Amino acid sequence: METWQELKVTVKREGEELVSNLLIELGAQGVAIEDSMDYMGNVDRFGEIFPEVEQQEEIVVTAYYPDTVDVTVVEADLQARLAELTDFMDLGEVKMGTTALAEEDWADNWKKYYEPARITHDLTIVPSWTDYEATAGEKIIKLDPGMAFGTGTHPTTKMSLFALEQVLRGGETVLDVGTGSGVLSIASSLLGAKEIFAYDLDDVAVRVAQENIELNPGMENIHVAAGDLLKGVEIEADVIVANILADILIHLTDDAYRLVKDEGYLIMSGIIKDKWDMVRESAESAGFFLETHMVQGEWNACVFKKTKDISGVIGG
């Protein structure tokens, strides 16, 4: 019987998606997240508070590797990559540990963390292996969470989805920068966008996004390609959405202003509390006006508008 190895990485909450993505790049066949926030129950209203559950500062990212992989090498590579990112993100004290699993244990272990989750008023994320019957008006996003890159339940992704739900009215062109799992592109299509162009610098993310898009019928209007932010892009958009690190977002705002149509929107998420002012200043310097600011725990997200009429925006 084939055996598997379970590598658990304990890290501050801010590092969830970063560590998950790195583990996939380092050959993980599946990734699961253990987070106290997951036990607050699924909600159909953004921002609901559950005071009876204490939010822990740390989460555990569990990655699964076949026994042919030398996990000690993975650990060393991961530590080296994380060390390079300490200036961008406080990951806390990173702890790692490995245990062996039988194949049936691996198959059951990582899937048990994922159930259908109502993320916003309209959008529900459903694991690809689950049969789920939608209620009237409910829009279903099928994902394979085992490939990581944002399963839709992380606060940064939730706020991005909520923002898309608020600004999309139908017929828009959307640019999804740093698409990861493709979840924001899929949501944009379900919410009525006419055409979506998704970009990611990571070749693995491009492949994963395409695979997730293919799990969802009617997504022919999504185009996925490798790309470095918006460099070289000449497509005008009604909405640009980017759920990436704050230190990268500030290099996006000028190109975003160039490409967003008048009265269009720039949605940004993935911003830890200490970086919010920096991102806001970057967007406003580019010419955008802040319309919506969202906060969930340590995370910030925002909707900026390209407009000459500032009467309806914050501070206007």
From Swiss-Prot:
It catalyses: L-lysyl-[protein] + 3 S-adenosyl-L-methionine = N(6),N(6),N(6)-trimethyl-L-lysyl-[protein] + 3 S-adenosyl-L-homocysteine + 3 H(+). One of its GO terms (molecular function) is protein-lysine N-methyltransferase activity. S-adenosyl-L-methionine binds at residues 157, 178, 200, 243. Disulfide bonds: none annotated. It is found in: Cytoplasm. Its main location: cytoplasm. Keywords: Cytoplasm, Methyltransferase, S-adenosyl-L-methionine, Transferase. The keyword Methyltransferase applies. Its EC number is 2.1.1.-. GO terms for cellular component: cytoplasm. It is an enzyme of class 2 (transferase). InterPro entries: Ribosomal_L11_MeTrfase_PrmA (IPR050078), Ribosomal_PrmA_MeTrfase (IPR004498), SAM-dependent_MTases_sf (IPR029063). GO terms for biological process: methylation. Belongs to the methyltransferase superfamily. PrmA family. NCBIfam families: prmA. Methylates ribosomal protein L11. This is Ribosomal protein L11 methyltransferase. The lineage of its organism: Bacteria, Bacillati, Bacillota, Bacilli, Lactobacillales. The gene is prmA.
